[in-house]
């Protein structure tokens, strides 16, 4: 078999390449994007692999999220979208994945002309669908229960909700790196005039996103005197914090969580002044099925290592397309 997902979460493509986890047998490692579940074992890969491949934006994000010295522990090569690298008798090309800044799909073509594709994490709308013979794909929302059937424009709803919250004072927005910068850009583009306040790490990630073309507006560090006064006085401003900080900051304030795990409603109030907005950076079930339909693979492997519905998605793919499909690694029980 020309692709596999190992028990440690490495996505093997062809003879030489492992994506998103360490694999001692493969000389090449790819990091598809800078989220923790796709950077597993990276220190080991840097020590032992001939090359670790990623986009320039992903490298810049890892420099901020880990440290600029971290990637110096090995040989890192950045690869632009659409550029091909040859290793032995295989060719590796990155294509854009609409997920977070720098996210990539990976195509490996072997000497027999077989096209082996790993989607990485993606949203279908702005992700190019690659023709594949063997397709390895994410399965985060791989169940038919994970469909976003609402028609409303979630971005517009999010902007309206934040503007409503600003009438009461400070609005705290919680999300993950990449998603936070996406919502900053949405608010900036919509002309929301309130100051943006961020802690140091979110600030540094945001500056990388701006360097790569995102437009986020002026950001104020939360430790600055002016920002402290805004937050302490519950003045109208928007404070952006990583989801991990939700129990530490903004208690009692107007709070908005951006999350993909919402399918019934685009916006839900679950406590007084606390809302969840369904802004996802993953395809829902219909988006995953659509990728398979357009890619026309002979074999699909779903990622059964990371969080999701890999086995359910396999059943649906077999039923709808009559093609071979496997959830890997196999888990029993």
Where are the regions a protein language model picked out?
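Short, well-ordered alpha-helical microsegments
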Residues: 39, 103, 125-127, 180-184, ...
């Amino acid at each position: 078999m020309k692709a596999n997902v190992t028990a440690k979460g490495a996505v093997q493509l062809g003879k030489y390449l492992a994506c998103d986890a360490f694999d001692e047998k493969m000389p090449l490692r790819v990091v598809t994007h800078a989220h923790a579940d796709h950077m597993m074992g990276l220190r080991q890969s840097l020590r032992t692999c001939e090359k670790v491949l990623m986009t320039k934006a992903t490298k810049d994000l890892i420099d901020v999220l880990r440290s600029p010295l971290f990637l110096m522990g090995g040989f890192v090569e950045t690869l632009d979208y659409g550029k091909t690298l040859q290793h032995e008798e295989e060719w590796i090309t990155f294509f854009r994945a609409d997920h977070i800044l720098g996210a990539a799909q990976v195509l490996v073509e072997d000497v027999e002309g077989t096209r082996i594709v790993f989607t990485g994490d993606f949203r279908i709308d702005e992700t190019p669908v690659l023709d594949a013979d063997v397709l390895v794909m994410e399965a985060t929302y791989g169940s038919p229960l994970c469909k976003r059937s609402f028609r409303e424009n979630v971005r517009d709803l999010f902007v309206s909700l934040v503007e409503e919250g600003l009438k009461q004072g400070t609005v705290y927005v919680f999300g993950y790196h990449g998603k936070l910068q996406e919502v900053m850009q949405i608010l900036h583009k919509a002309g929301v005039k309130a100051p943006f306040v961020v802690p140091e790490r979110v600030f540094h990630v945001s500056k990388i996103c701006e360097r790569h073309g995102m437009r986020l507006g002026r950001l104020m560090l939360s430790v600055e005197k002016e920002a402290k006064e805004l937050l302490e006085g519950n003045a109208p401003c928007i404070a952006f914090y990583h989801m991990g900080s939700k129990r530490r900051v903004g208690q009692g304030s107007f709070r908005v969580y951006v999350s993909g795990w919402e399918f019934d409603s685009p916006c839900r109030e679950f406590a007084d002044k606390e809302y969840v907005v369904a802004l996802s950076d993953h395809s829902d079930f219909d988006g995953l099925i659509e990728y398979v339909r357009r890619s026309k693979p002979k074999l699909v492997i779903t990622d059964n290592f990371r969080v999701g519905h890999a086995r359910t998605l396999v059943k649906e793919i077999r039923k709808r397309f009559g093609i071979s499909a496997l959830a890997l690694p196999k888990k029993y029980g």
